[in-house]
A protein has these predicted regions:
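Amphipathic alpha-helices that form helix-helix packing interfaces
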Residues: 15, 198-201, 243-246, 262
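Short amphipathic alpha-helical surface patches that serve as generic macromolecular interface elements
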Residues: 202, 221, 237-244, 256
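Short amphipathic alpha-helical segments with heptad-repeat character
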Residues: 6-9, 122, 164, 233, ...
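Mobile late-domain/C-terminal helix-loop "cap" segments
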Residues: 228-250
Length: 269
């Protein structure tokens, strides 16, 4: 992973410093837990994609850092809220806010991160604000639809639509906002659409192979619908191939190489 992110190491270091300034500046008695949650072995996949595409599209704009911050704050807030809905006790080998403080304080902590994101959004363009509003709404509707279908073995199309709405949107939103700053290669959005869907399905497969908490929570995923891990893995592989084909129009560079390697690393080569 270090080799993959090396070309954007400076951008990621700046991002971490900016994120700490935003998250840790407010007086919040849960701040030590929030700091651990936000800064202990983070993946930062969304900011990494944003910075790589910014380099590929030669976007030199201070809003790139803001878009990465907003995307990560919304993603982090969604994790806290997901833990409440799923009644999860641990995340990344640490107690969740829900487990440690109960649903009321956990909701507020997630809302706190959302408020920080909204504050940042207010300093962007009108188009970027509309993009985030649209995608956040779709994500929430996806969560509502998932809960409506709990304990129902739905068809594959319904599962894919739910997965796209609930999870893929939080990958897509940052890049859609970024692409609004460039007149070139806006068709690259289809790359992240295919990648994000594959990424979540792979997570569902990993969950099915390990603790099966999705099934316990009444959330039936692709391995259950197919009754086959092999078919589910093939589905992910096909989405990965489709995603990588979308990069053929991009000229070769260290950033494109990192993008390809990141997709392979996270989805399986």
């Amino acid at each position: 992973m270090d080799k993959i992110i090396f070309p954007i190491k400076n951008e990621l270091n700046e991002f971490e410093n900016n994120l700490k300034k935003v998250v840790l500046k407010e007086d919040n008695f849960l701040i030590s837990d929030l700091e651990k949650f936000m800064f202990t072995n983070p993946k930062r996949l969304r900011p990494i994609f944003i910075f790589l595409f910014a380099k590929i599209l030669k976007i030199e704009n201070c809003l790139v850092q803001d878009i990465a911050l907003i995307t990560e704050l919304i993603h982090s807030a969604s994790l806290i809220h997901d833990d409440i809905i799923d009644e999860e006790k641990t995340r990344r080998n640490n107690p969740t806010f829900y487990e440690k403080y109960g649903s009321k304080l956990a909701v507020l902590e997630g809302d706190f991160l959302l408020s920080l994101a909204l504050e940042k959004i207010s300093n962007t363009t009108l188009e970027i604000s509309k993009i985030f509003a649209k995608r956040i709404k779709k994500t929430i509707l996806g969560e509502i639809n998932q809960n409506e279908n709990l304990n129902n073995l739905t068809n594959i199309e319904t599962y894919l639509n739910k997965t796209y709405a609930k999870t893929a949107n939080l990958f897509i939103v940052g890049l859609e906002a970024l692409f609004s700053l460039s007149r070139e290669n806006k068709n690259l959005l289809s790359f992240i659409e295919n990648y994000a869907l594959a990424f979540q399905i792979k997570n569902d497969i990993d969950n099915f192979k390990s603790n099966k908490s999705d099934i316990k929570n009444g959330n039936y995923t692709l391995p259950m619908l197919y009754s086959s891990l092999e078919k589910s893995l093939d589905f992910v592989e096909n989405l990965k191939i489709k995603a990588l084909k979308e990069l053929n129009s991009i000229e070769n560079s260290i950033y494109k190489t990192s993008l390809i390697e990141l997709a392979k690393y996270t989805l399986g080569s």
